[in-house]
Design a protein with these regions (language model features):
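Active-site cavity-forming subdomains of large catalytic enzyme subunits
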Residues: 88, 92-135, 237-517, 521-527, ...
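A structural-propensity feature for long, helix-poor, extended segments
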Residues: 39-51, 55, 277-316, 512-522, ...
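A glycine-rich phosphate-binding loop feature that marks nucleotide/adenosyl-phosphate handling sites
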Residues: 44-45, 63-66, 81-87, 213, ...
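Internal maturation/activation junctions in enzymes
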Residues: 213-216, 222-224, 543-565, 591-686, ...
């Protein structure tokens, strides 16, 4: 006892400070961890005690004391702080140090209006409750559990937590497994463990499988899925990708679509390449159009006005092709100088670059800018067809054009990139040449984080004519329509019909334009933790579960806009990515960029690609192929590796397809019969979920060995995972690497990936030069990369810094 010091309990009672009660928790928090000592923690914390302190303050003091001790040579204080936080969380949710029954959790969540009613009735809750593994909470770092608490744990209206970590993971798993009722889905070796006549038993089998990979941190679903699966607002998708048509109906219909998607937390990537340029025609009047910038200004205001459920402003990336006449104004969008009415500081500009532009840069040639009003079909073409049409337009005298030096435009692009981090660079032809669904459209842009590459299509419009008798008829805008005006019969275009006209003797009442056939792509994401899943055996075990789980997201998702649901159900696109590559390398004592590194990731991503494709083909046998399968490259037995960049293939000396564990020949034949998913793999940024799972971010090297993260509690020191004398030198900070190594590693991964990678480049100001940047991005283009995300720069003098997360897409994390 400590005379004179009393503690105020949670219920308001006072009692003398009893250090033995505190010691019970400090001992448990330090148990089994090297380099930490409970007595040291108590000694430092005791000095801060005072009379009348609350139990919450004691807990906060202990946690803060442990957090302050986190350092490169004492990383395990991270886990001490995490355990102390967990003990407090247990008490806040259950009133004791432990888990309550799953049924109690669901009932409380339903009463609070936060958990979807009816979900718990689909399962044997006693069975699932006994399967929960509370000991897996010990995996959390302090920042990991704090991130889970701040962003993902469900809370009631008074902001009190109502779930514990393993309940969260089980709730997500149950939500994603609720449609699994087919007894044929159970593998033969497990059929004796399941009552095949009981849907609850079948669902429970898959819920356990999903729970295991999530709760072991082998796979983590993206933020929207982790946040919203199990809740009444089950919007599970990360990002949306769309394209705008060049008419007033298309523009404002897209604004509404963007607003609704942003309202429910989705990141957005949108193609504006069709919008006519400044000074273009409107209704045959020259110099009437204001160009793309005023429309982007409105888009910027939408991002601010329609924030994401009041938590953060919307996030929208806007794409144009570099032949657009407004390209120079577009590059100035985020400048702090110049006319403010032509700035859009809250957007994320991105370029959709054709091969021809890069060739003109290489040969120091001229580049011709066009008005999309006159050359809009260029947005529908890529490769040789694009080049042929582009050169044809260059040679036509009747086309509005402007010539610039390609190299000068490229220099301006790279300068803006270095100064602002934008525009993101995406390569149109590299994307479309490897489009597994080129039979059903064209890829027009990427998403906010530049890893999603799927077909999109702007709305096409028909003229809907409603007659005074209530009947309706539809015409294309350019159809020739015979109409009468009084006694005079004339032929007008569909878009010129008015309410003064008669058609076939019927008086026109109203004329409207209605949208048809648009496509807005959807990103449903999860990431494999390479620090835990990196052997052929483990990949074969985990990847099939992840693919099945992601496929279920498509059917269980809430779609804010019908077009997104229609598109997603037609192509059934998912994006399985990866994180923890830097941790894997450090733990295996492999230097970043070494031949051993490049060979290892080649082998790992071959395995992930193989099992992702195989699982999707098997799901097609079980549940049916995606509706747009026929005519796809999949249907012809063409796999992503078959269209891989030839130069990228030379980066690793490996005999492709020689590994006995991957029977690619048989897989090709299986794939020809059906694929469940039109798109399969994409590597997203994973910022939040990598923090949560205590691994390194996505496929990148670490920024620092130690840095600070900022959250509601202040600055939290962070040390790279499993740091020791054995791993220290293998955690090479990103800014110390030759960035061409990052590009080569990305090219090796890209061989196996049907979509793309969110790839950042890291430059210190003393190494930055136009020549170096040109070499990096030219190399990426030549090696078949589809995109580059941020260009991050910092001074070489910076030793420890606060990580800036403000520029990251919350959804793709």
């Amino acid at each position: 006892m400590y005379p004179g010091i009393t503690v105020i309990k949670r219920d308001g009672r006072r009692e003398p400070l009893d250090i033995s009660k505190i010691r019970k928790y400090t001992k448990a928090a330090c148990e089994g961890l090297d380099g930490v000592d409970y007595s040291e923690l108590e000694l430092d914390a005791k000095l801060q005690f005072r009379d009348g302190i609350t139990t919450e303050e004691i807990q906060d003091t202990l946690i803060k004391t442990a957090v302050d001790k986190i350092d490169i040579d004492k990383p395990n204080w991270n886990f001490v702080a995490a355990r102390l936080f967990l003990y407090d969380l247990y008490h806040r949710v259950t009133g004791y140090t432990g888990y309550n029954h799953l049924r109690e959790y669901f009932e409380r969540g339903e009463r609070a209006g936060r958990i979807l009613p009816g979900l718990k009735e689909k399962y044997d809750l006693d069975d699932l409750n006994s399967y929960i593994k509370p000991e897996r909470d010990l995996q959390f770092t302090y920042l990991g559990i704090k991130t889970l608490y701040d962003r993902y744990i469900i809370k009631d209206k008074e902001n009190n937590p109502i779930e514990l970590p393993q309940q969260l993971f089980m709730g997500v798993a149950m939500f994603l497994a609720q449609n699994e009722t087919n007894p044929n889905s159970i593998p033969n070796e497990d059929k004796d463990k399941v009552d095949l006549n009981n849907p609850k038993s079948i669902r429970g089998y898959w819920a356990k499988k999903f729970y295991d990979v999530i709760s072991k941190f082998e796979v983590m679903v993206a933020t929207p899925t982790l946040s919203n699966a199990r809740t009444t607002r089950h919007q599970l998708s990360s990002c949306y990708v769309g394209s705008m048509n060049d008419n007033i109906e298309g523009i404002f219909d897209d604004y509404k679509e963007m607003a609704l998607l942003s309202k429910f937390g989705g990141g957005i990537g949108w193609d504006f390449s069709k919008i006519r340029a400044l000074g273009s025609f409107i209704d045959n009047h020259k110099n009437a159009a204001g160009g793309v910038i005023p429309w982007l200004k409105i888009t910027n205001d939408i991002a601010i006005a329609v924030d994401q459920l009041g938590t953060r402003k919307g996030a929208i990336a806007v794409y144009i092709e570099p032949w657009h006449m407004d390209i120079l104004d577009f590059l100035d969008l985020k400048k702090n100088s110049g006319e403010e009415r032509r700035r859009a500081h809250d957007l994320f500009p991105a370029l959709w670059i054709p091969d021809l532009f890069m060739k003109r840069v290489e040969e120091d040639g001229l580049w011709t800018l066009f008005d999309p009003y006159e050359t809009g079909d260029l947005t529908n073409l890529y490769g040789e067809e694009f080049e042929k049409k582009y050169i044809e337009y260059e040679n036509r005298e009747d086309i509005t054009k402007r010539k610039v030096k390609a190299k000068e435009l490229w220099k301006k692009i790279l300068l803006e990139y270095y100064e602002t981090g934008n525009p993101f660079l995406c390569f149109k032809d590299n994307a479309n040449k490897r489009n597994q669904n080129d039979h059903s459209g064209i890829i027009r842009s990427s998403n906010l984080c530049t890893e999603i590459f799927q077909n999109t299509e702007p709305n096409h419009y028909k003229v809907k004519v409603t007659f005074e008798d209530g009947s309706e008829e539809y015409f294309n805008e350019d159809d020739d329509v015979k109409v009468s005006l009084g006694d005079v019969e004339v032929v007008v275009k569909g878009k010129k019909i008015t309410s003064l006209h008669y058609i076939n003797g019927k008086k026109v009442y109203i004329v409207e334009k209605v949208p048809f056939d648009g496509k807005t792509a959807v990103c449903n994401l999860a990431s494999v933790n390479l620090s835990k899943v990196n052997t052929p055996e483990k990949i074969a075990e985990v990847v099939p579960i992840a693919i099945r789980m992601l496929d279920n997201v498509i059917d269980l998702n809430y779609y804010p806009v019908r077009k997104t649901k229609d598109t997603n159900l037609k192509n059934r696109a998912i994006g399985l990515g990866a994180m923890g590559e830097a941790q894997l390398l450090a733990e295996r004592q492999i230097f970043w960029g070494s031949d051993e590194h490049l060979k290892l990731i080649d082998e790992i991503f071959e395995g992930i690609s193989y099992w992702a494709i195989k699982t999707s083909a098997e799901l097609a046998e079980e549940k049916g192929a995606y509706p747009e399968f026929e005519g796809s490259r999949w249907s012809k037995g063409i796999l992503p590796i078959d269209t891989a960049n030839e130069e990228a293939k030379k980066l690793v000396e490996r005999d492709l397809f020689s590994a006995m564990q991957y029977d690619w020949k048989s897989l090709r034949e299986k794939v020809k019969k059906g694929m469940r998913n039109g798109y399969l793999m994409a590597i997203a940024p994973t910022s939040s979920i990598s923090i949560l799972t205590g691994t390194t971010q996505t496929i990148e090297p670490v920024y620092k060995r130690k840095w600070y993260e900022e959250n509601l509690s202040g600055l939290i020191p962070v040390v790279v995972p499993n740091l020791s004398a054995d791993t220290y030198m293998f955690y090479t900070p990103a800014y110390e690497l030759d960035q061409r190594i990052l590009v080569k590693a990305a090219a090796i991964r890209q061989k196996w990936i049907d979509q793309g990678q969110s790839l950042n480049i890291f430059i210190t100001t003393d190494k930055a030069s136009g020549r170096y940047l040109n070499e990096i991005y030219m190399l990426g283009w030549k090696l078949g990369l589809k995109s580059f995300y941020y260009l991050r720069s910092q001074s070489p003098e910076v030793k420890e810094e606060v990580m800036d997360r403000s520029v990251e897409c919350f959804g793709c994390q």
